[in-house]
């Protein structure tokens, strides 16, 4: 039995008749509903489909409602709009159909928040621009450093900018109501920057008497800097490598991933590693060797779960990718290096005696091949 959980994102590919059931039986432990896509009622229907399946099969799996968060995007563009290095582009918060001269930005406070010299990244970092001026009202002028196609509704990242948008947008609050009405197990909070973002969501959950856990998605540099406080307040964290890899230098992502996993283990908080884990299996029946290694390393480092995104939501082989990931996880867990994830207790720890007993119990269980450890308590 694998201990590392598999999170599968639901979408058109996995919601085909019979596929959802196969995913469950092949090893999915958490079904993720991405509220960035679909209407609230469509997502409610998906949640109900999962619940019906779990009732029928008498199997256990969690449901994660992943909120979109303050994702920045450009508006509609004219077809085949291409910008070249050296071009100047005007970003406006006044709605328009964009061209190579002017682009609509959905973020209304953009002219007030950005500063001269800051970076604008578009389409997952494929296009790079630098701010050269702002009228502090409705327009920002940027110079193209790395050009390419400007396509409609593509995402925007501002790695140097302190964005004034709230962590929970009006859309998120509407989606959250649906998720809580259907009693999901987890709520994913996107683009977390500081612990106060988690406290804001916690206040809403408490007000609605919800027992849902908060999954803080680490995808902003500010969140990496405040990781200790975030781990204290959140119920679990996700290393969301997609936007994180755009917001910070790519070469930093593996080190940040290892650091977050290590800190999560120390604080006994579940940690998920996500994004492009088995990306090639969107179109291929087998993963690349690098992807196999990526999943395995996450397991060996101590990740509690590994996540599939487009692989199961829109990929050609959703069942096969879960089956393959499950095999990789099981094989990786057979290594002795994955048995005991916690660090050795130090005499200066506040709970040194309890920690030392638990640590040695785990080592002994591993040595003798025990199937389980029984802990007796007074209070439960």
Language-model regions, residue ranges each:
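Non-catalytic helical/linker scaffolds that mediate oligomerization, partner binding
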Residues: 1-380
């Amino acid at each position: 039995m694998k201990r590392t959980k598999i999170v599968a994102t639901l979408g058109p590919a996995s919601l085909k008749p019979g596929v959802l059931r196969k995913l469950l039986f092949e090893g999915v432990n958490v079904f993720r509903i991405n509220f960035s896509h679909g209407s609230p009622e469509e997502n409610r229907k998906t949640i109900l489909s999962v619940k019906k399946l779990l009732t029928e099969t008498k199997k256990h799996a969690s449901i994660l409602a992943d909120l979109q968060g303050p994702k920045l995007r450009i508006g509609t563009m004219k077809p085949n709009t291409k910008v070249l290095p050296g071009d100047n582009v005007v970003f406006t918060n006044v709605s328009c159909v964009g061209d190579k001269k002017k682009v609509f930005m959905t973020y209304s406070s953009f002219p007030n928040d950005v500063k001269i010299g800051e970076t604008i990244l578009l389409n997952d970092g494929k296009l790079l621009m630098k701010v050269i001026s702002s009228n502090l009202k409705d327009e920002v002028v940027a110079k193209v450093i790395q050009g390419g196609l400007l396509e409609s509704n593509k995402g925007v990242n501002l790695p140097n900018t302190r964005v004034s948008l709230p962590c929970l947008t009006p859309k998120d609050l509407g989606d959250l109501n649906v998720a809580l009405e259907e009693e999901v197990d987890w709520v994913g909070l996107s683009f977390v920057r500081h612990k106060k973002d988690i406290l804001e969501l916690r206040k809403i959950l408490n007000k609605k008497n919800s027992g849902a856990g908060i999954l803080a998605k680490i995808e902003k540099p500010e969140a990496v800097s405040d990781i200790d406080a975030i781990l204290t307040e959140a119920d679990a964290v996700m290393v969301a490598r997609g936007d994180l890899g755009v917001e910070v230098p790519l070469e930093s992502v593996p080190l940040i991933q290892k650091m977050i996993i290590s800190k999560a283990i120390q604080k006994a908080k579940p940690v998920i590693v996500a994004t492009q884990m088995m990306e090639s299996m969107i179109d291929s029946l087998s993963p690349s060797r690098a992807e196999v290694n990526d999943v395995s390393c996450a397991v060996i480092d101590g990740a509690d779960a590994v996540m599939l995104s487009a692989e199961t939501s829109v990929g050609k082989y959703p069942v096969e990718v879960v089956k393959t990931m499950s095999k990789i996880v099981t094989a990786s867990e057979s290594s002795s290096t994955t048995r005991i994830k916690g660090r050795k207790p130090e005499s200066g720890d506040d709970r040194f005696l309890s920690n030392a007993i638990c640590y040695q119990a785990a080592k002994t269980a591993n040595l003798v091949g025990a199937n389980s450890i029984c802990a007796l308590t007074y209070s439960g």
